[in-house]
């Protein structure tokens, strides 16, 4: 994809908000080149506009929340993931509530709607962020890293003390095709005891078997089961793609994560952008030359403090 892209026409949908339980109406409209992704609260007096960028992240508890001038929109990661995964650079997202509709808990409904209205090429070249040197962040056992690569690669590993999850790892090179085929249908998941606790606190009020995979101590409660045997780690990748879009441009680099989440993903973006010597920008035509070679730079085991990820890197 050499040039920037946006929607061919408007799309609209309605679903509940995962945490509020309220019905949410959302419309996504085309945007001009270099406009980026803009969120708009249509239920506020002045139709508050919020640019999707790291500086506007206000919370990463349970979901990623973007806010500006007193207005905020939460649970943005799935729609941002769909737009990024399908190569959409510019769009205006309008919602009449402080939360993005959860749909079925994955990005598949958004991808299907994008395909239905179509995606068009714009007149300006894309700009890519090219990772030049490894950057990493950690918190406890959790770890996230961006390293040089000649494409956007993702390697992710999770561990849960549950008989149906245990350890899962996945690696892919991201493209429209791999995102649609392998990632976008993976649903958010949670544990019944946690859902009950959150709902007692007035959170996750919209959560149900229609929009999440719910597990008790031994099994999956959803009658239809999983969409893929590794749906859990794939959903974490889906979330990460949305969180990494806070960079504001497509990435040429290798994202490596072990038990990461919204907070750590946001911390990684911040750490990367704060160190200008570790990245540069380039057009698609020359991004492979931005760090002086056409293949991914090698990095040694000592660069990776979370050694448990190594098994996933070579999967």
Swiss-Prot record:
Example of a GO biological process term: lipid A biosynthetic process
Cofactor(s) required, per the database record: Zn(2+)
Keyword Metal-binding attributed: yes
Pfam families: LpxC (PF03331)
Pathway of action: Glycolipid biosynthesis; lipid IV(A) biosynthesis; lipid IV(A) from (3R)-3-hydroxytetradecanoyl-[acyl-carrier-protein] and UDP-N-acetyl-alpha-D-glucosamine: step 2/6
This enzyme's EC code(s): 3.5.1.108
Enzyme class: hydrolase
Active site per database record: 262 (proton donor)
Substrates-to-products reaction catalysed: a UDP-3-O-[(3R)-3-hydroxyacyl]-N-acetyl-alpha-D-glucosamine + H2O = a UDP-3-O-[(3R)-3-hydroxyacyl]-alpha-D-glucosamine + acetate
Binding site for Zn(2+): 78, 235, 239
Summary of the function given for this chain in its UniProt record: Catalyzes the hydrolysis of UDP-3-O-myristoyl-N-acetylglucosamine to form UDP-3-O-myristoylglucosamine and acetate, the committed step in lipid A biosynthesis.
Family of the protein in this entry: Belongs to the LpxC family.
Name this protein carries in UniProt: UDP-3-O-acyl-N-acetylglucosamine deacetylase
Organism encoding this protein: Syntrophus aciditrophicus (strain SB)
Lineage, broadest ranks: Bacteria, Pseudomonadati, Thermodesulfobacteriota, Syntrophia, Syntrophales
